[in-house]
Each structure stands twice: as C-alpha cells, then as structure tokens.
Amino acid sequence: PKDLDASEIEVRLGATWIDKEYIQQFMYETFNTPFYLQRSIEVNYSSFTAEWQIKGKSSVSYNDVAAYTTYGTSRANAYKILEDSLNLRDVRIYDTIEDADGKERRVLNAKETTLAAQKQQTIREAFKDWIWKDPERRQTLVRQYNEEMNSTRPREYNGSHITFGGMNPAITLREHQKSAIAHV
C-alpha cells in the first residue's frame, strides 16, 4: 500500500509500536520532570506481558505542580495517570472503608475518579499535540509506522479474464460482476 502521511496516522498513548524513549521524552517535557529525578523515573515496556510500567512514579514531591495539579490530582499523580493511559486503563480512585463487620473494603470515589479522568484526557490530548511537533521525530515515526503497521492492503479481484462457456450469449456480465465471481 501507499505510504501514509503523519496527518493520516492516528497515534494513541499506549501504542506499542512507539518506542519507550519517545514516551519517556514526552513525560519529561510535559511534566517538567526535574533533571535529578529523570534518572529514577523511567518508562519500561514488557513485550511478554504487553504492559507499560513507569518506574519511580511515587518519588515525585507533593509540591510538584505539574505532577499533582496540572496533569494529576492529590490522589493520583501525573505519572500514575500516564501509566494507566499507556496500559489503556481508565484511572480509578478508591477509598478504603471499614464496614459494620469490621472488615476493610475498597469503594470507588466518584468525585476523585472524575477529576482524575479529566486529567487523563488532558494527558492524552497533550500527547496527540506533542507527538508530531518535532519534524525529525515525525519523519522517524511515519517511516516506522509505514514499515511496521502499514503492510496490509485489501485484495483486489479482477474477473475480466473469465469466460463463461454455455452461458446465454444475450447476457453480458459487467466488470464488477466478473470481479465478484473471481472473488468467490
């Protein structure tokens, strides 16, 4: 098939064909990760479990505005939300309560979950804006996508060579009808 242009490729956060270095670069740039934390916070992808993991996501200080306010909440920082997004999971915030029997159980906190879901959508939109901005990255990703993912095209059937002996000569089949017969 013909190569696709960047405008024709939809890239979602969590796409496994995107190299983890790009995800990590997006994370550092978007969340303004301090240089001293960049060594401890890193993105990993396991092809065996098909799971993304952000190592060191809890080492971020609570006074980090990007991680806990702009792209995260007080209950789920931006790195945790990004990890859920990479694994194609909706972020959920639970509270632990004690029931009448004295057993602890987890209950979904709807208000905090809604707030975290809004932050998750903000991160997804930021990624869509960021991924194609750099011309060099754009060129590399378009080439990679076309080589790895854009390799299948629908078959085209041509029945123009088929003849039908014994068919009524008054009936002539159209090209699409012959192609449909070739398909079968």
Pin down the residues of each PLM region.
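Charged, low-complexity intrinsically disordered regions
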Residues: P1-S151
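Conserved pre-motif I regulatory segment
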Residues: Q139-R143, E147-V184
